[in-house]
Design a protein with these regions (language model features):
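Substrate-binding/catalytic lobe of Class I Rossmann-like enzymes that use SAM or dcSAM, i.e.
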Residues: 240-325, 329, 333-339
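Class I SAM-dependent methyltransferase Rossmann-like catalytic core
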Residues: 47-89
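Conserved class I S-adenosyl-L-methionine
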Residues: 94-103
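A short SAM/SAH-binding and catalytic strip from SAM-dependent methyltransferases
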Residues: 193-212
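A short glycine-rich, Lys/Arg-flanked "PGG" loop and its adjoining helix->strand segment in the class I
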Residues: 212-224
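N-terminal auxiliary segments of SAM/dcSAM-dependent transferases
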Residues: 2-53, 61
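Conserved SAM-binding loop of SAM-dependent methyltransferases across substrates and taxa
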Residues: 104-119
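Conserved beta-strand signature within the Rossmann-like core of class I S-adenosyl-L-methionine
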Residues: 221-235
Length: 362
């Protein structure tokens, strides 16, 4: 389990004002153990699967940043439109903002501009700074602001945190490197209201049971009055969905195949070579989701000595690397209500491509 406890743990090479808590990093022994556990859980099943969190080493995070700028990939633009329009409503009253799966923190800047204006006066910094914060449920105009980005990629997160400290000199930044699906709390926060962000449509990467476990975990570590903002992709034309995950430039293909490199580099194995695979994105209408696969272009035999396991794939067989569920707003709101989150607002972009739902813990 990974606790959200910024300000403790490894702080090597931290920029001024940044303390990075490292719980899981791809090149660490802990990451090897975590990936081995994930492989044992899914790689030897039918079909073999690997959780999408293993996309995001430093290269994978940079590739995904490129994907968000592609013409075919509408979710980032649509979500950004909603964030720009609703930023004041989203951050109102919050003194701590926690982003799960923060990555480069690029999409969050529109909220940070409203939450802690660049160079704004009266913003506290450093652990324990309150600077006029009032009790939970509201804050004074000069209340300290704290941002806690959480991500699995230590390299990317550390770089992003350093940039944020320079761009928002009054903002306390406490990055946490760890698995966002295994947080045991308690959530960090100044006195005042906490806002948890889960953007980018990542909620769609979970199976039904995984989503239930994730929401139950969040409810367990959040307090009454805390708010949760979730980004979700809306159901639309299958052709448009497939194009968003199989772009003409091949960036998504490189992103997908990079996971093969991550596995080969992180765990001891032989016979695993990205040149033996190709990228595929397909629409699964029955599950209302896009599926990403790496398909073997020839017969492969992979040996994992430390696991005492092998896996053979015939040409044409694949490894499922991601699912991306598409939602109807009412279904997601009902799901959240069943886990103790009450709807406060649901927004979509002008084109009706993407949605944000803001809920509060009862």
């Amino acid at each position: 389990m990974t606790a959200l406890r910024p300000g403790s743990g490894s702080a090597a090479r931290d920029a001024p004002g940044v303390t990075t808590t490292t719980k899981t990093a791809i090149r660490d022994p802990a990451a090897t153990a975590a990936l081995e556990a994930d492989l044992l859980d899914g790689f030897f099943t039918d079909p073999p699967t690997v959780p999408p969190r293993w996309f995001y080493d430093e290269k994978g995070s940079l590739l995904f940043d490129q994907i968000t700028r592609l013409a075919e990939y509408y979710p980032t633009r649509a979500e950004a439109e909603i964030l720009r329009t609703r930023a004041a409503d989203i951050v109102a009253g919050a003194t701590t903002m926690i982003e799960l799966g923060a990555g480069t923190c690029e999409k969050t800047r529109v909220l940070l501009d409203e939450f802690a204006p660049r160079g704004g006066p009266g913003l506290g910094s450093g652990p324990g700074s309150t600077n006029g914060a009032s009790p939970r449920g509201g804050h004074s105009p000069d209340a300290a602001r704290r941002f806690v980005p959480v991500d699995i990629s230590a390299e990317m997160l550390h770089h992003a945190a350093g940039e944020l400290v320079r761009e928002y000199p009054g903002l306390q930044v406490d990055p946490v490197v760890g698995d966002l699906t295994a947080l045991d709390g308690p959530l960090p926060g100044q006195p005042g209201e906490r806002l948890v962000l889960f953007l980018g449509g990542t909620i769609g990467n979970f199976t039904e049971s995984q989503r239930a476990q994730f929401l139950a975990m969040l409810r367990r570590i959040m307090d009454p009055g805390d708010r949760l903002l979730i980004g979700f992709d809306l159901v639309k034309s299958p052709d448009r969905l497939v194009a968003a995950y199989d772009d003409a430039a091949g960036v998504t293909a490189e992103f997908n195949l990079n996971m093969v490199d991550v596995i080969a580099r992180t765990v001891e194995c032989t016979g695993l070579d990205r040149r033996d695979f190709q990228h595929q994105a397909v629409w699964n209408a029955g599950e209302s989701r896009i599926e990403m696969w790496v398909r073997a272009v020839r017969d492969v035999h992979i040996d994992f000595p430390t696991l005492g396991r092998t896996r053979s794939l015939a040409a044409g067989e694949g490894i499922r690397t991601e699912i991306a569920r598409k939602f109807r707003p009412s279904a997601l709101v009902d799901d959240l209500a069943g886990h103790g989150f009450r709807e406060r607002a649901v927004w979509s972009d002008a084109g009706g491509d993407f949605g944000l739902v803001l809920v509060v813990v009862d």
